[in-house]
Structure formats: structure tokens, C-alpha cells
Amino acid sequence: MKAVILAGGFGTRLSEETIDKPKPMVTVGGRPMLWHIMKILDANGIREFVIALGYRGDYIKQYFLDFYAINNDLTIELATGETTIHDDDRPDWRIHLVDTGLHTQTGGRLRRLRRWVEDGTFLFTYGDGVANVDIGALVEFHRLHGKLATVTTVRPPSRFGNLALEGPQVTAFHEKSVLSEVWINGGYFILEPSAIDYISSDEAIWEREPVEGLANDGQLMGYRHPGFWSCMDTFKEKTMLEQLWGSGEAPWRIWGQDPAPMVRSVGD
């Protein structure tokens, strides 16, 4: 199964970081968010990626061209030009880097990638969200319901702490709790190629007309993910992710375990 990752946005709310790079290349723990997402998917058995480029797409291309040098220790013999790569971090990835336009909207970017995914069911997600979602269970859920689209739904963190009260007495205080009755779009869609028919133009925002159309036609199902999820829209969220990574307890760091089998397309 292929994974499509949107990586063309400007990231205006992280403007100090994104003045010279696309948002998915903002780092957490010294690694781009895009790398974290690809490692999550790799741990779930997905190793072929279609990256939708836009703003500073050249930055992403150069990162992968220099991937071995960036992610490994090197010995360079200047006299001979010989380079030795140590540690040899060589993930078994196939990466398609595709320009989808500078100002194209999220739906339009997916529409421009149609020829890259028309061979079967695929995963579609954003370049700024990490989660410990079970992709195998997500794909199985999609296979069983037989609709065109599945969205992973997550509980958003509350902006405020909440209190438990008994009369005027505060009996508990919970900081950064989740909104237990609310489910939102967490990305990590599973789509059939014909879901792209719902995208009319480059100006189409995926989360509006296309997704609303799929829902209205009964072709969108929601997979509930009760575990960890976070986007990185603000510096506050970036700081939180950095702290989790630095603690050694980042919930989305699911790799380093036994390799998962390749996730196959629905119907294989």
C-alpha cells in the first residue's frame, strides 16, 4: 500500500521556522516531522510514499538526496573523494517526490496525484500530525465496511484544564485533558482511488467539498483512535512534542520493534 503525505503548505503559524522550509521539515528531536510520520508508517508496514510537494519542495528533495549523509556518521577522504557511511541507516523506502503546485489547496494536491495512486487503496495524511494509530486495524476496518473513504477520528486535547467539583470543593484538577465527547479529523485516511472524483479543482480544500460530499453520499466512515495524536500547528505544540521526544517516552515512537509485515492493498 502507498501512503500519500501532504508536504506543500506554508505553515504560517510557525513562520519563524518555515521562512526557509516547508512545515513538514520543521524538526522535533532534530528530525523533520515528515521523517517521524514516515517512520510511523514504516513501523506499520507501509514503505512506499508519494510526497505532495509545494512551497520549498526543493528543500524536501535535497533532504532525501542527502539522506544517508544527514542520518549517518561519515568518514570523508578529501584527497581521494572517498566517503564511508557508518551506521548505515538505510530504510527500505520508495519515495516519489511530486510537485503539486505552490498555491494548490489540499484537495487539489491529492487530485494532481491521481495517476500515482490509481492502482489501489492508499493511505492519505498530513505532514504535520503524529499518532500511535494501528494502521493494520485501520485498513481492516476500511476493508470490512466497503466504502470509498475512512478517516481516523481522534479526541482533541482541551485548551483548558478542567475541574471536578463537589459543591465549592475542588476534588480534582486535570490539565490538558481530552474532550471525551468530541471526535475530530486526525488525518490518516484510507481511500479508494475513486474518492478523488469528489475533488473538482486545484482550489478544492479536501476537508470541505470532497469530504462533505463523501459523507453526504454515505461513503465516509470514521475509525476511532483512542490513543495518542497531536498535530504541530503552533510553537506550543512543537514544544510539547519536543518535550515528549526528549523524555524518551514519545507515544508515536513505535518503531525499533520487530518489523511489521507490509500492509497490502484491500482485496489482496
Residues covered by each model-derived region:
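A conditional alpha-helix N-cap/helix-loop micro-motif detector
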Residues: 30-31, 103-106, 204
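Solvent-exposed polar/charged
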Residues: 43, 115, 213-216
